[in-house]
Amino acid sequence: MTTPANAQNASKTWELSLYELHRTPQEAIMDGTEIAVSPRSLHSELMCPICLDMLKNTMTTKECLHRFCSDCIVTALRSGNKECPTCRKKLVSKRSLRPDPNFDALISKIYPSREEYEAHQDRVLIRLSRLHNQQALSSSIEEGLRMQAMHRAQRVRRPIPGSDQTTTMSGGEGEPGEGEGDGEDVSSDSAPDSAPGPAPKRPRGGGAGGSSVGTGGGGTGGVGGGAGSEDSGDRGGTLGGGTLGPPSPPGAPSPPEPGGEIELVFRPHPLLVEKGEYCQTRYVKTTGNATVDHLSKYLALRIALERRQQQEAGEPGGPGGGASDTGGPDGCGGEGGGAGGGDGPEEPALPSLEGVSEKQYTIYIAPGGGAFTTLNGSLTLELVNEKFWKVSRPLELCYAPTKDPK
């Protein structure tokens, strides 16, 4: 089957684009007019798109008229990409290329000494590489020094875990005779108007008169009894203070808290506790790692201490008081009658605090304001707050005497 002649002629016709139809040839400059060209635009015109360097042995594609270095375009065609690197037009082989000596002559006219130009380029590249390496080295050294300083500062500021467990509710039990040597100093430092601090739990031989705990009825912070008796100073040291070690020197920074502080309201159970003199609301501030057993032990110590203080204040003539048969306000015990020395009758034995246990009181919580839930003694206050409370106000707990303490 033969192809018509008009079809063959149509296939050989070059269809012009709209731009090609409207373009006009530029007039040649025949006089001595000079046109200034910027180095940037000149470099972009003389640069090979493959090696990004000045064209060398220029080869031009026959289809799209793009220029490349001879070695660059031949290597590109050998790699299997049979297309123009600039416009992706199909290039069958090296036959689709032609040399462009006119462009080489133009380059040699602009840059007469090609070797000098290449040597200058090499010097610039070497200098840039050296400066870049020096800057990278200096920046790396500075970054390393900065990281070392930061890690060193973190090691210095890192708190020692468990360093302040002695004065919080979660602290261990001290020896029974720790407060005997400095009774007056400790009792004076633990006055109710001293600086607040979390000290709900006290050593086994002491009380719980810390200034961070307030009561609805105005809890006492120490014993104000007879100054002439020998055991009043001991009681003041063991009951009023609560510090388990030598005092910190003035100006020394206090150790950081092991956990976040938790404020809680301690109320008597409305159904299990009868109204009495020891059923006031108590406000406690302590750390989150304190447990429910710590609260129970603190409550038992606090109530036992208050009863002991009231027993001391309620005796006729006071502890070690003078003549109680003379009558008058000075003769009835309390804080005023204890200054007479040891001439009076022998002081009766006061109730001991050694038998105080965390089993004497049970702690409850009402999450929704309804039913009360008994708290396990091993739970921490932080866990209780997250599990049962979940509101942004002080934790509210209730206490009641244990019916059958074991």
Swiss-Prot record:
Residues 175-187 have a biased composition (Acidic residues). GO terms for cellular component: cytosol; nuclear speck; nucleoplasm; nucleus; PcG protein complex; PRC1 complex; sex chromatin; ubiquitin ligase complex. Component of chromatin-associated Polycomb (PcG) complexes. Interacts with BMI1. Part of the E2F6.com-1 complex in G0 phase composed of E2F6, MGA, MAX, TFDP1, CBX3, BAT8, EUHMTASE1, RING1, RNF2/RING2 MBLR, L3MBTL2 and YAF2. Interacts with CBX2 and PCGF6. Component of a PRC1-like complex. Component of repressive BCOR complex containing Polycomb group subcomplex at least composed of RYBP, PCGF1, BCOR and RNF2/RING2. Interacts with PCGF2, RNF2; CBX6, CBX7 and CBX8. Interacts with PHC2. Interacts with MN1. Interacts with USP26. Pathway: Protein modification; protein ubiquitination. The modification Phosphothreonine is found at residues 24, 215, 220. Pfam families: RAWUL (PF16207), zf-C3HC4_2 (PF13923). Residues 246-258 have a biased composition (Pro residues). The modification Phosphoserine is found at residues 38, 140, 187, 190, 229, 232, 248, 254. Residues 30-234 are annotated as: Necessary for transcriptional repression. This is E3 ubiquitin-protein ligase RING1. Residues 230-406 are annotated as: Necessary for interaction with CBX2. Constitutes one of the E3 ubiquitin-protein ligases that mediate monoubiquitination of 'Lys-119' of histone H2A, thereby playing a central role in histone code and gene regulation. H2A 'Lys-119' ubiquitination gives a specific tag for epigenetic transcriptional repression and participates in X chromosome inactivation of female mammals. Essential component of a Polycomb group (PcG) multiprotein PRC1-like complex, a complex class required to maintain the transcriptionally repressive state of many genes, including Hox genes, throughout development. Residues 148-263, 309-354 are annotated as: Disordered. SMART domains: RING (SM00184). The hPRC-H complex purification reported by PubMed:12167701 probably presents a mixture of different PRC1-like complexes. A zinc finger (RING-type) spans 48-88. Keywords: Chromatin regulator, Metal-binding, Nucleus, Phosphoprotein, Repressor, Transcription, Transcription regulation, Transferase, Ubl conjugation pathway, Zinc, Zinc-finger. It comes from Homo sapiens.
